[in-house]
């Protein structure tokens, strides 16, 4: 769990929206809901007075007063309903506006400076960012508003009804000592005892709720991973292993849920007893005055109602305890998530990548986190990232224990000089691409990479959004502005003729297309975007050699102003390059770079 004090963590999450560009609407809605809440309390005070008169009319058998009071009640009821409906409506409006702003604000931070990628490279003490963004922000907003307005209503209700209860209850003499407004002191003592006991009984729920969200997210992530890799699991016949993994993860969900059930069972024993006793308790305490004739039935009912309002206001902590536990857990999770994003963005301070028209490695040293997995090129998936995370938690200053991977010494790639990057698996070739892309944070020194708007990086497994084929072709740009005829032409060039009539079809193309088709779609993207620099990280590994040669010839001939920089293992690819950047591992030290003609 996060170790930051609770209230600074809360303020860090709550303040930004109310000073944002949407602050006027936020404060207007907050003020309106507050006004409606106060108006509802005022109606409750009027109904308390009505309550006394109504029951007195019953006791005195005054039918005319009875009829008149029923008409009054109808008016108060209509007013109460209108106020309650609009209070709920405006509350939900504020919930959605606040959640929308929070989600957009923190998703932008998560995506900025490749923080979302860097979070996968080391253990920052957080997990499942999708859970944090999709669910915890919703819970934070909903719980904050519910608790704020609940506390506000309880405070104002106490102030409104404590005077009524003081006046109606009168004094009581015990052992020769007269206690004025004795019902007020009884209500305070009753609520105080309940609050202390509620905290003692319900405290374990805070940690249990925190862990439950984590276990649920881990289980859901494993299901998504299985769905995305269904073919591989089926081919390996790994269903039995997956089932065991699912059972183990869901077992943690169930085990923690049992603990929550037991904790909530204990708390419900207490809260139910406390709530049921509160119904009859004021009448038991006030009964002597009623039977002595000091008050009428209406006065007794007013006392019961006022005591209930005061006791309910003072028992806010008891009634809201479960929600408070969930609220605190969500704030701790979100604060840890924001800390992790900020620390991830701090990484890379020692590695400077300038933008220019050439690639120059100067005196850069590229590092990799210390962990069991030494193949930096294999950090592609969530599972691989978890292996890298074995390096240990990232301290608050964002420093990660690393080892040198590649050391450069002034190698330069000039525009127009198609370059093949070669070397054994795991020596750091893909990591060099990540450095040039500006997303790899581990290392020291300076190097020059292409301008971001002039470069396109093509990984071995291209990303295909779940969207139309048109959007997948033009990713990451908006799917407008390119003529359909041009899109069909490019698809035909990369031998995807069967897809030319499906531009507006939406699908999960990563499942609909074979790996080779996906790689050819990525090549089609390059033909459309026409970058000055094109980096291919085994981007044709799923193609047969004839198709691979055809694709490289197409790139070379069609993109005359583009410099190709390729990582590939097939010797045939060398024919489409003029020089080789060799990455050579060295025993006991980082790999070296050497640029040679082909």
Regions found by a protein language model. Give the residues of each.
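Cytosolic ends of transmembrane helices, especially the final helix of ABC transmembrane type-1 domains
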Residues: 206, 217, 232-238, 281-282, ...
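Primarily ABC-family ATPase nucleotide-binding module
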Residues: 125-126, 338-420, 446-451, 489, ...
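ABC-family ATPase nucleotide-binding domain "signature/switch" substructure
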Residues: 472, 504-598
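Helix-to-loop junction immediately C-terminal to a conserved catalytic motif
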Residues: 437
